[in-house]
Amino acid sequence: MTQEFAVTTPETTQTVGTARVKRGMAEMLKGGVIMDVVTPEQAKIAEDAGAVAVMALERVPADIRAQGGVSRMSDPDMIDGIINAVSIPVMAKARIGHFVEAQILQSLGVDYIDESEVLTPADYTNHIDKWQFTVPFVCGATNLGEALRRITEGAAMIRSKGEAGTGDVSNATTHMRKIRQEIRKLAALPEDELYVAAKELQAPYELVREVAETGKLPVVLFTAGGIATPADAAMMMQLGAEGVFVGSGIFKSGNPAQRAEAIVKATTFYDDPDVLAKVSRGLGEAMVGINVEEIPQPHRLAERGW
């Protein structure tokens, strides 16, 4: 079998990655933890704790939420510092719809780009055309329709959104359960009803039929938003996540290095209560957090994207 790496489009002579390679790169992260870091020192702590990748950004979601204002792509020097500090893959965030930020991140050599609702959207109508890039993209989703639309645009990994920067896992569970529930519902439909389902999901029929036949997304499904403890990570894995993003929950806690290692172990041994109890001991204070229900609707980050 021939291996695909990239293709050059004749119209532009631009090299773009194939879906097989992009999705394969995301597959390599399955079962792991991806941690938000703001300094090279934090990146090293994450790597030493067993993170499969780090997300380089100037402010963790809790600080973005607290400080307000317009949140944009991180400074290239800061991203370079983290890339040079670790040997594991480095992700970075671009604003929804901001294809030039994505072009810059690709030029910097990041391994993955997160088109993220945590940053202030640059376009309230269009997401980035992710097929035009060699680097794979990860995108958030709160339901199956949103996930399928992002995959149609070229996303190689989906993460259920949750509510970033809160330390409240409730929205993460809601979104993961909803995506999984909608997949099961789709798989139970007779084939002639998939056309209507595709219309309702606002997604291509061929992609809807593939999900119905396989019972899963064609890309990796991680979870994110509000995961602050080993138990949170393990619960999300038991609910069907294939890996975990942890943002503010580690470096806003009392003992980041120990908590990072504990969350990695909990993600690996998510179905072993004895291991979970052991790694949950003596972690110190978790991030204080915010109850999602107390956040006004306009300030909920998960509402961004469509």
From Swiss-Prot:
Query: Which SUPFAM superfamilies does the record match to this protein?
Result: Ribulose-phoshate binding barrel
Enzyme class, first EC level, given as a word: lyase
| Chain positions recorded as D-ribose 5-phosphate binding sites | 36, 165, 226, 247-248
The transmembrane segments are none
Biological process annotations from GO: amino acid metabolic process; pyridoxal phosphate biosynthetic process; pyridoxine biosynthetic process
Q: Which residues bind D-glyceraldehyde 3-phosphate?
A: 177
User: Recorded GO terms, molecular function?
Assistant: pyridoxal 5'-phosphate synthase (glutamine hydrolysing) activity
**Catalysed reaction per UniProt?**
aldehydo-D-ribose 5-phosphate + D-glyceraldehyde 3-phosphate + L-glutamine = pyridoxal 5'-phosphate + L-glutamate + phosphate + 3 H2O + H(+)
Active site, per annotation? 93 (schiff-base intermediate with d-ribose 5-phosphate)
Q: What pathway is it annotated to? A: Cofactor biosynthesis; pyridoxal 5'-phosphate biosynthesis
Q: Which UniProt keywords apply?
A: Lyase, Pyridoxal phosphate, Schiff base
Report the EC number(s), separated by commas if there are several. 4.3.3.6
Which portions of this protein are annotated as coiled-coil regions? none
Similarity annotation: Belongs to the PdxS/SNZ family.
Entry-linked NCBIfam families = PRK04180.1, pyridoxal 5'-phosphate synthase lyase subunit PdxS
What's its job? Answer: Catalyzes the formation of pyridoxal 5'-phosphate from ribose 5-phosphate (RBP), glyceraldehyde 3-phosphate (G3P) and ammonia. The ammonia is provided by the PdxT subunit. Can also use ribulose 5-phosphate and dihydroxyacetone phosphate as substrates, resulting from enzyme-catalyzed isomerization of RBP and G3P, respectively.
What is the name attached to this protein's record? Pyridoxal 5'-phosphate synthase subunit PdxS
Origin organism is Nocardia farcinica (strain IFM 10152)
